[in-house]
Amino acid sequence: MVEVDSRKQLLYDPIVRLSGIADKFVMQDATSSNMKVSLQECIDTLANYQDECKKLKRNEPTLSPSERYSIYESAYIYYKIIHIMVLTRIPSLPQFSSAKSSDATNEDKELMQIYNMLVKTLLSDEKIAQIKSYLRANYPDKNSKGKESIVNKQLLNNEVFMLPLSGSPISAVQLNHLIQMYDSSLLLIDVRPRAEFDSKHIKAKSVICVEPVSFKNSFTDLEVEKKSLITSPQKEIALFQARDKYNYIVIYTQQSEKTQFYMHQQLVLLDILMNKSFAKPLNEKNIKVFTLDKGFSGWVSKKGACETTTQNGDAIYISGNTSSLNLQNLPQLSPNIGSSMDKSMRDMMSTSADFEGRTYQLPQQQQPVFARTPSFKNLFNKAKSSSTSSVTSSSPAPSQLVRPQTSSMPPLEQNFTQYPETPKLLTQINTNTMPLSQISPISSRAMSPMTKNMLTQSPQLPMKISRTTIGNGAMLDLKPHPDSKPPGQPVPALPQLPHHMTGTYQNLNQPKLDLDFTVGLENMGNSCYMNCIIQCLLSTHELSQIFLNNSYEKHINLNSKLGSKGVLAKYFARLVHTMYREGSFKRPLEKNKPIQPIQFKMACGSINSLFKDNTQQDSQEFCQFLLDGLHEDLNQCGANPPLKELSEDAEKMREKLSMRIASSIEWERFLTTDFSVIVDLFQGQYASQLKCKVCGCTSTTYQTFSVLSVPVPHVSSCHILDCFNEFTKVEKLGTDELWSCPTCKKKQPSTKKLTITRLPRNLIIHLKRFDNMMNKNNVFVKYPFLLDLTPYWANDFDGRLPPGVTDELPTRGQVPPFRYKLNAVASHVGSLYGGHYTAYVNKGINRGWHYFDDTSYRPIKNETECITPNAYVLFYHRVYGV
């Protein structure tokens, strides 16, 4: 466990001792539940804190070491009291909840303005970090043995047993003490991805993993239990269900520059347990909830005991244990039952959690008693007229005040995903040097794996700082700046959620995008196959938007084994930006200069040599390549180890399940190695089932797709549904294809049937017109503007779940009906080697359908021109309520 020296060092930490004194002051005062009085106490204490800071600034050179240290101690205690009052005591008051509501009185609104100003003052304080550093560096026991008059020795020696108030952080020493002495009444909650938890976590009797992407700040404790833990082992679910039976709950996560999202989610979960535990109220039973100071890495550095959890990939089928699946439960990333429209991309285009501009509420505490000063009246009156406030006592200027130690985060601009600059392709054009040796090729489908990277981060809107006099100090006005733009990740400072958060990636004042931009693309030598696919793919507004607002950058995974380290994604984004610049906000018949996508084509050629020269290629193959390549660049799980093959027992168990359930499990298994916005937008799944005609034994495999290839019957004319009938029909295997039945132990007459088990948000249908000999079937396949594929979706759920699984698996949008509207058509005339590709694309209500032939484009001549016998690839988008 914790080493003796490290324990002693933590035990005599002056910050812990002084925090205990501040806690004691707050606990001893229970005189008022009035929010106005509590705010007055905070302002009085703030004045005292600022006076101490002023003393240090004015007189520090003339003070003796003991006098100086005493002032630093007083300053820290005053600050800590304000911290507890503002972030814990006041949010627990009944008046605070009513003041936050939409029907709050004017007086309550003014109180909230003052409260927010106090919070902002805490967040912007730049002196407290220096105070902490000084107290630790100049501790009397360290520099002047015997001079301990400043220190309360009894408090010091008992620090490990004096736990702070609920909602506060505790040290590694204190957690170690709880584990040793109260292990049976202690619950640990690890807020890290399941893979990291399984690899190593704190050793304790009761420890569970709640993945940071599985909950959001609007959840209650019951929603965490029912939704966030749906894929957790039954043992962990049972532990969380018994959360009201413990005396202590400690939440911890990984604390580092790269895990700020985890740290933010730790605060969100703390808020849920302390203020939204409606199913099992923890406050009523006096259960203390803490966070672990310095997190899991701090525990490991102090040699805290850890253990590893090993999981078998087929545990879901054998025991109902879904923990190895690492479900990516992003809020609303896939639409839920009852979605009236497809809104689920909002979080991917924005941030991880949907912040609602609420003030972070923490646990109930009591107030300290301080002598009143007349400053509150001035502040309150000032707030009425100017929404700002003043305090009579002086304070250090904001430039001198620092965030508290809980928020030693890097600058925001350092939080974006850093990926290598792509090669200067233009230089290579000029020098005719094509190879980009540093780019790793994407040679196959994205079936690789990882330790899940942080999926989404939550930006905090920069605040417009308007200063008004507060004595000689300053207060800050919490108004979003109209020009502010969301940075990459949150910087959690104090245990408090950021104010004025945005729920969408587009800023409040960001101009609306014209996602139906229209521009031609130059043919660079048989590149029509590329041009038509680009035009068709960009009919998907969600895809265009994440590249136009650059949110894709935050999802680039440098560790993805099959990715190009962002090269393909970056050059695709540049192309989309260029097309948008030339083709957006144009009048219906206004023409513009065509775009030459030469750099994008060279990037594609550097990744896959098939697209390097000027030979004609199959547009469907390019579409598959582009989607796979973008997926691998943005694959959040691209470095995970591959899933183990199912055991024979697990396969038998899977065959007993309905395809609806088995396919859902396989989809979750797939997401542990492949998770990206491309998956969410375009990927579906089908089942391939072999069946022995002698004994009836079956074997089913599940395959994902982003482009669904359906056969075209050799008839004079057919409908697209005929192609789906052909795709899903029972096929009798020939003599040379007989299946070796595991039950009969020999090859037997057998059949094969494909069943669509997951229909994606955007369905790309490839009409297989070419056979193995490259002969083309030119039959006119009729396809509608509105396509209903509900009858082809596996809907065979019989109520059975794997043993041990009591809750349904996530639907992830797989709720009928499945209706699609036609968005685009890639057409082909001629042979595979000597033909030409063009595109029909729906450019929205204002522009209507357009025909694209490389550089030229025009509105279609009549309503049905886009229903062409030359159709080769169809692009459909799912619609609701039609």
Swiss-Prot record:
Gene3D superfamilies found in the cross-reference section: Cysteine proteinases, Rhodanese-like domain
Low complexity bias (residue ranges): 382-399
Statement: the UniProt record of this protein carries the keyword Ligase: no
GO cellular component: late endosome membrane; proteasome complex
PROSITE patterns: RHODANESE_3, USP_1, USP_2, USP_3
Keywords: Cytoplasm, Endosome, Hydrolase, Membrane, Protease, Thiol protease, Ubl conjugation pathway
Region (Disordered): 382-411
Catalytic activity: Thiol-dependent hydrolysis of ester, thioester, amide, peptide and isopeptide bonds formed by the C-terminal Gly of ubiquitin (a 76-residue protein attached to proteins as an intracellular targeting signal)
Major enzyme class: hydrolase
Rhodanese domain mapped to chain residues: 182-308
Family note: Belongs to the peptidase C19 family.
Protein name (Swiss-Prot/TrEMBL): Ubiquitin carboxyl-terminal hydrolase 4
